[in-house]
Amino acid sequence: MVSRNHFLDPELVSKRVKATDSLLNDTHNPIRHLERGKIHLALGFPDLAATDAYRALTLFDSVLDSESEFPARKRIVPDALWNCAVYVDEQSEPNSDASANDSDVSIGSDEDEASESDSEFEDVTLSDYHEHIGNVYTLLVASLAQCGCMRDAYDFCIQGLKLEYGAEGNLAQPFLEKSIKEIQDAYVNQRRLRAGPDVRDGDIQFDPAGLQVQGHARRVVYPWNAHEPDRNSPEINIAPKCEVRTVNLPALHGLEADAENDSNPENREEVSVQLGLFAKEDIIPGETILHESSMLTATNRLHDDLCDACNSPLPELGSAEPSVACDNCDDTVFCSERCYKLACETYHGAICGEEGLASIGKDIQNPKDKADYLYLLLVARAFAMAETQKVHPLDLPEVKYIWGDFHRIEDDPCDAWAGRLPPPSATLPFSFQLNILQPMRILEEMGLDPFDSLRTYDTWVVNTLYAKFRGTASGRLSTWDGGPEVCAVHPLWCLANHSCDPNVRWEWGGEITFVARNETERVQWGSSEESERRKNDRGGFAIKKDEEILNHYCDLALVVKERREWAMGALGGPCQCSRCVWEESQS
């Protein structure tokens, strides 16, 4: 189990809670976003600080644009009085649901929010803008740079230097000028190291287009995340012949792919409590153990002949069970009436008729970006599912029990960031586009206010979804260019732990199936005596009662070093299965 918050300053965590409460009561006040962003940066979460700063910038920009869709305004009533009024109002309703203000309900769909009197708010003024805009740019640039998103940090430096600041904002100009020089110098130095000693200083020119776009965020269970399940919970039946149980796995964080060079025995002995699939009875070779379909799917092909729900191919014209088109959408088709009804119940209800969503993340030209945008589309589908089902996205059954390869929170994460060296937990890919801008756009296209929706769709929720999807989503490659084009999250498939000697094979279509491997399909490794012993122990069965059902996340034909490198992203460290340990000992 990952430690939660005992390595973070409890006073700062408390300040973060209070700042968030104030923000949720005053969502269109850019000063509230700025205040919380500073706390996030102090806590060692520059990714969250960057998002707060960008939201503050967006709202402050509306002060200069009277036509802005999201005008900046601030609550007149002090927080204490407002909270007291809300409490009195809730106590006066005998049938009020105690969970109505909990994070399980989307603020974006809460009609009570829209009924708030305009007399409780006043416009953010031009004076407010001049007083704070410099601090906004300072926080935004510093946070993006700490994450490693250098191109966006540079762009906002240039943008910020074009503005006129008030008395407070004058302090921002020297910082932005210094940041530009640091970014330029770092770029030139990196290129010089790559080019070798024969290149002269003047031969390398700064090119903003060559700056790094993708950085990293900490991949942790946030201290305020109350949605992670108890991984020591009772056994759960999920199919006729298998069930979910807890299992102690070796902790892989901190080990290198070439694990034989790891000299610290404690790294190999540390245990991580996870969930796994186990056989409830003996299973014969070739037996299908599990059929699992999922509505948590995504495709990056625009106008493709795939079912919008399950991503299976649409039936041929004239088939006995024809495809079904949504009457309220321009180009949303389902493979069957059953899929259409299930989609409406699980996700389509929240996005039906919202045509602006159709092009987001589709037909991406750069092959390197295709997988990243598929993960974005999975986040968008999770948003739609949560909004349709009126639950928090992290409480969706398809999401809740997935392990996100979370790391332990470091003792002093801020010290690592301050030294421009990301802490060990900063392994989650993070970019301004995919973690900040596009999720806000998705909420807008869904008809939600991205500021009023923070209780349910804040950036820490987005990051947690990304952490759960990366390494667990299954996919299919395009027959056109070989890049990923379809992916899906099958939570039970994800629960089956990895081994380089798996006892099941899996097939991906509109659903995933687990089939028990026969002897000819089992990986042959170890001495002939050991192989024969393992075969005899199985006693003619593929999987014996109480044995763990083991999946695989990499090409089993690779050598141990290559397998470990391939599966590092999904496992969080080098594989320590019996086969890998034995092959490592032989090499």
Positions of predicted regions on the chain:
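Short alpha-helical interaction motifs and adjacent low-complexity tails used for partner binding
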Residues: 1-587
